[in-house]
A protein has these predicted regions:
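Extracytoplasmic ligand-binding site segments that recognize negatively charged/polar headgroups
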Residues: 1-11, 84-88
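Secondary-structure end/capping motifs
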Residues: 99-171
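A short alpha->loop->secondary-structure connector
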Residues: 10-20
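Short helix-initiation/N-cap motifs at beta->coil->alpha
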Residues: 20-50, 62
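Alpha-to-beta junction loops
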Residues: 45, 50-59, 71-73
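Small-molecule pocket liners
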Residues: 73, 87-96
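Ligand-binding "clamshell"
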Residues: 11, 66-80
Length: 171
């Protein structure tokens, strides 16, 4: 979704983000573009920007907050400000897999629904515990303070500029 949100935002500001033409053999999305957009794995974005390989990035959290935390960048806008309550993440499986593992499929979907409910219940009271879990190397592995900035209803645009954004992460 970030690719489309970035392209929408750039176009709304008068910057042509380019377009895709797979029927012409082009899948880069750079045709007639005013800006070069490239793909970098999200966890590598802060280090790639710090190295000077890229000048900015569009990504989900906690990688924007990581740039603020490291002092190498600042978010200029959130996707929530571009499109409130936008569809963010998708869990998809193939029909073949769903038919081969129907019980597993059902259990995974139920577990995700329960986790989402747990994250949102009691006015987000479980978010601090989720931050501790996600900070472990076997999960996201980002610093707790970085994760907390977006998971607990605040967002830091630059060092010291923390704002309440209670609906930033709604599950």
């Amino acid at each position: 979704t970030h690719n489309y949100e970035l392209r929408y935002w750039l176009a709304a500001g008068g910057i042509h983000p380019g377009y895709y033409a797979p029927h012409k053999g082009d899948t880069s999305g750079q045709i007639d573009a005013d800006a070069l957009l490239s793909v970098t794995p999200p966890p590598q974005m802060p280090a790639t920007m710090e190295a000077g390989t890229i000048y900015g990035y569009c990504v989900g959290e906690p990688w924007n907050q990581q740039a603020v935390f490291k002092g190498i960048g600042v978010p200029v806008i959130t996707d929530y400000e571009i499109w409130k309550n936008n569809p963010e993440k998708v869990f998809g499986v193939s029909n073949v897999w769903a038919e081969k593992y129907p019980n597993t499929h059902l259990r995974v979907v139920k577990a995700m629904i329960r986790a989402a409910m747990w994250l949102d219940e009691n006015n987000n009271a479980n978010r601090p515990e989720a931050v501790k879990i996600l900070s472990k190397p076997s999960y996201v592995g980002a610093d707790e303070a970085v994760l907390a900035n977006s998971m607990t209803g605040t967002f830091e645009y630059e060092k010291g500029d923390k704002r309440d954004v209670p609906d930033f992460n709604v599950f």
